[in-house]
């Protein structure tokens, strides 16, 4: 819709311009400050220029045009809105989608939590964001690949194995053991210890030479838990890349770095000169004892990713990784790639309340708020909605009790109620959507046209959400559209009115946009509300 309007305006103006959406839809659907850019050139006030330009659009078939305070305002005509509504309904649940125009557009790596414990609430924001970004990007025609990077080559895996051994000896065999704070705790450790006992027998907990075997077993069990948690919220990741499996590539990647001339040795330690590209200090990649650092593993992984030849790479990280960006981008540059192809999206912190009191999050202490805990409290729909309801650049705080309310204060309830209400009205009218598809919406009153316009801008919202990486604009749109619908419904009699079919068709478009948008954020729209 917006593109059609822009191309028509450009045909008349013949120059590039900015097209905005005024806050007041009663005033106009679109507006441009184009006249302000011409004031100096033509030595006239923007108001005079805008009024003169408006005359060029007289009797336009798509919109009425008028000027206010130097702005050109465009109000879409009923016939145009009706044709757009017909197109939307014919596309049904493909409304707003596009076919892929190319391959290997975006590679998204997200979550990538250490495989030493279940996902906690701090991981969920990146998980929901990454999955939603992939869903919506694919829907608007981009080729997207998703991956989870498994950090399974560091000391934390050894700690997992020792944690399982110590727990088994303490809890299963009633031994008095020292259990330092740095080791992992929690119900999942108990579950894994019991599984290990059944599979390997008691001896594995006492044989230090078998700690790696126990750690690998524990890692695999943790990954099963992580995959199950993700599946329960509808997140399916295409590839699971193991850090350990990439270490065969380490030597080749280090040679590539060395050939760039941006790697050097000092005190038998190997550094990359990341300060050359804005890092705070040069970073160690190989320790003096020959062991690679965590950064070295990450560089190997990014080398492997960039070899796949995607146009753009997105890493979704926690905000505490902000200082890590410069060193990774420097390494990518030194490997001969364009570092601007890597985009890092940071997730700010999440704090969770219940009955107004904060939960403490600490995976190792076994007192973390797990993703599965939240799921059991509020369900997948509320979880997915709340975690993209705010810009990722802002911290997120919410009370799970608020998300259980069945009233307008709970946004997911309010939005679902709008969708269910449309079905309710059709049932009351004893009609189906197909019965009214031929109704003409050209003569809706202003409030009806504005509601229709709001329902029809869904494709623009989706495009903007992806290109600006502002996925919170989708739940904001859903809340706004639902509020507009409820207001219109409360102010207008539908069943039995002279324009019943027109209003039912209008509601069909509203319900379609709600259904499509909810689906894209991983939520199935409710056809009826259950109390």
From Swiss-Prot:
GO biological process, one term: arginyl-tRNA aminoacylation
GO molecular function, one term: arginine-tRNA ligase activity
Keywords carried by this UniProt record: Aminoacyl-tRNA synthetase, ATP-binding, Cytoplasm, Ligase, Nucleotide-binding, Protein biosynthesis
Catalytic reactions of this protein: tRNA(Arg) + L-arginine + ATP = L-arginyl-tRNA(Arg) + AMP + diphosphate
Enzyme Commission number(s) of this protein: 6.1.1.19
Gene3D superfamilies, A to Z: Arginyl tRNA synthetase N-terminal domain, HUPs, Isoleucyl-tRNA Synthetase, Domain 1
Subcellular location: Cytoplasm
Annotated Gene Ontology cellular component terms: cytoplasm
Principal subcellular localisation of the protein: cytoplasm
Motif ('HIGH' region): 113-123
Pfam family, one: Arg_tRNA_synt_N
Family, similarity comment: Belongs to the class-I aminoacyl-tRNA synthetase family.
Description of how the protein assembles with itself and partners: Monomer.
Family matches, as PANTHER family: ARGININE--TRNA LIGASE, CYTOPLASMIC (PTHR11956:SF5), ARGINYL-TRNA SYNTHETASE (PTHR11956)
Protein name: Arginine--tRNA ligase
Species in which this protein is naturally found: Campylobacter fetus subsp. fetus (strain 82-40)
Gene that encodes it: argS
């Amino acid at each position: 819709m917006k593109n059609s309007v822009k191309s028509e305006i450009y045909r008349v103006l013949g120059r590039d311009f900015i097209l905005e959406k005024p806050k007041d839809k009663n005033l106009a659907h679109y507006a441009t400050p184009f006249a302000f850019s011409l004031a100096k050139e033509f030595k006239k006030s923007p108001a005079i220029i805008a009024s003169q330009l408006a005359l060029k659009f007289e009797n336009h078939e798509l919109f009425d045009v008028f000027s206010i305070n130097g702005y050109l305002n465009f109000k879409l005509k009923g016939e145009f809105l009706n044709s757009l509504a017909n197109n939307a309904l014919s596309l049904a649940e493909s409304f707003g989608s596009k076919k892929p125009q190319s391959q290997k557009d975006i590679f998204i790596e997200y979550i990538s939590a250490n495989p030493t414990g279940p996902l906690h609430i701090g991981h969920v924001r990146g998980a929901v964001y990454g999955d939603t970004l992939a869903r919506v990007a694919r829907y608007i025609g981009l080729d997207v690949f998703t991956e989870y990077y498994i950090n399974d080559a560091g000391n934390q895996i050894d700690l997992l194995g020792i944690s399982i051994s110590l727990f088994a000896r303490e809890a299963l065999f009633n031994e008095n053991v020292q259990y330092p704070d740095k080791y992992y705790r929690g119900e999942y450790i108990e579950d894994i210890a019991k599984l290990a006992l059944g599979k390997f027998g008691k001896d594995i907990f006492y044989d230090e030479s078998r700690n790696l075997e126990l750690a690998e077993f524990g890692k695999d069990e943790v990954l099963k838990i992580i995959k199950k948690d993700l599946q329960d919220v509808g997140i399916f990741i295409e590839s699971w890349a193991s850090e350990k499996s990439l270490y065969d590539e380490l030597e080749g990647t280090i040679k590539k770095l060395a050939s760039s001339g941006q790697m050097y040795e000092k005190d038998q330690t190997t550094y990359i000169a990341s300060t050359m590209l804005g890092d705070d200090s040069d970073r160690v990649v190989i320790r003096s004892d020959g062991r690679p650092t965590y950064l070295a593993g990450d560089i190997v992984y990014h080398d492997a990713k960039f070899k796949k030849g995607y146009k753009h790479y997105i890493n979704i990280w926690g905000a505490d990784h902000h200082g890590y960006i410069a060193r990774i981008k420097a390494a990518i540059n030194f490997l001969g790639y364009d570092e601007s192809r890597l985009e890092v999206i940071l997730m700010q912190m999440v704090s969770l309340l219940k009955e107004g009191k904060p939960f403490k999050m600490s995976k190792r202490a076994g007192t973390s708020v797990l993703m599965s805990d939240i799921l059991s409290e509020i369900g997948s729909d509320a979880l997915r909605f709340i975690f993209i309801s705010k810009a990722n650049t802002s911290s997120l705080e919410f009370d799970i009790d608020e998300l259980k309310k069945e009233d307008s204060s709970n946004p997911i309830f309010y939005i679902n109620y709008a969708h269910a209400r449309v079905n309710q009205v059709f049932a009351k009218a004893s009609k189906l959507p197909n019965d009214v598809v031929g109704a003409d919406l050209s003569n809706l009153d202003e409030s009806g046209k504005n509601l229709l316009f709001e329902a029809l801008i869904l494709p623009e919202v989706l495009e903007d959400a992806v290109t600006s990486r502002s996925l919170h604009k989708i739940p904001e749109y859903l809340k706004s559209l639902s509020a507009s619908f409820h207001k219109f419904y409360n102010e207008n009699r539908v069943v039995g009115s002279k324009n019943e079919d027109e209003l039912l068709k209008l509601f069909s478009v509203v319900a379609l946009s709600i259904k499509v948008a909810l689906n894209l954020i991983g939520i199935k729209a409710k056809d009826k509300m259950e109390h």
